[in-house]
C-alpha cells in the first residue's frame, strides 16, 4: 500500500492487462449478441440436493457466508483506491459475480428433493426471460459487460471467457468439496471455499496471461504478486490432477509427480519474472534488513510453537483449547511485525505457508506413507468439533483467516518505513485477521473462562468473554495509535467500536468456522475508516 509501488498488482489476486481501451457501440452490440447466443449452450451446474448433502455435523446452513467475500472485495470499486495501478475493479467485479453465483448455489442447486419434485408435478415451465435471468451463467455475462466498462479490457467478448471460467470453477469446486469430503463443511463454508478458489485462480490466470501478452518492467511488489499467481495456478492444477487421476495418489507416483510440478512451477515463474527463481528468491530475502529480522523472528516463533506442541503431547497437561489459543498468540506475533515492516514479504510467506499446509493435508487424507501418520499425530492436539469430517482444517482456517486481508487488499503491498505513521485505512485492514482472531477470539476465550457468568442464549459463550474480546481489540489499536504507527480520527474510533462489537457478537453466536468468518467481517468496515 505504499504509493511508490504504483505499478504493482492489487495483491495476489490482482493484475490487469494493458489492452487498448475503448470500443465502438457497434462492437459492443455485436459482442452482446454473440454472448447471448452462447449462453444457452453452456452447461447447467451439477445439482446438490440439500436432503442428500452430508454437511458438517451440528452446523447450520450458514448461507449468509456467501456475501462475505464480495463485501470484502467491494472497496476495490471505491474512488479512494483509484490511485492504485492497475485498478482493482476486476477483482471486485469478479467477487460480486461469485457472490451472486454463491446465492444461486443455495437457491437453485441446494433445494430439497421434495421441492424439486413439487415443481415438476406442477408442470409449470419458466418463461424464457426468467429462465435466462436464473441461468447459472447469466452473472458471467453481466460481469463481462461491467468489466468492459470499468477496466482496460475493452470488449465483453474478451472478458467473457474469464467470467465463465470463474463461474464454472465456483460450481465445480463447491460440488467437488461436498462430494469428496463429506461432513467437512456447512453449506456456507463450502460455498465460501469455492468462491475463494474460483476468484484466486481466475485472477491469477488473468495476471499471468497479461504478463505474457503485454510484458512490461515489473516493480518489486509486482514480481512478488506474479510469483504468487504462478504458484496458485500450479498448485490448483496439481491438486486437481491428483484427485482426477487416482494413480497419482499411489506413493511411488506421488513424490515424482510432486517434483515434476515443482520443476514446472519454477520454470514457468522464471520465464514470467525473467530471472531464475532460486536466484530471485535469494535476492528477495536479502532485499532489506527488515526481512532478515523477520526471518529470524519467525524462526524463533516456529521453534517455540514446535517445542510447546511436543511438550503438550508428551505431558498431556495442557488442554486442547489452551494449546489452540497459544497458536493464536504465536500467529499474532508473526503477523503484526510483518504488516508494519514488510507486508509484501509477509504476503509471500503467508501464501507459501498456506500452500504447504494444504499439501500436507492432501498427504494426510490420502494416507500417503511415510508422512501421513506423522502428520495425523501432529494435528491431533488441535482437533475440535469442527474437524469431525474427513478434512482437518482448523490450522489452515487460522492461517488463511489472518492472511485473507493481505490477499484481498485492493492496493499494492510495498515496503513500510520504520517509524512511519500509517493511515488507519491502510494498515488496520491488513490486521483485521489478527485483531479478530489472534486478539479478539483469544481474549474472549480467556475472559469467558475466568470471568464469564452470563451465557449467550443457546451457546456456551459468555457475555463477559465477548466484552473482553472487544476491549482487547480496541486496546491493541490504541497501542498502535499511541506508538505513532497508526493515525485514527474520532469518527474512526466510533466505527471501530461498532465493528469490534459486531464481530464479538458474531463470534459468540455463530456455529460457522469463526477463523474464516471473523476476519472477513472485520476487514470490510476497517476499509472505510
Functional labels for PLM-detected ranges:
Residues 1-529:
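Hydrophobic alpha-helical transmembrane segments
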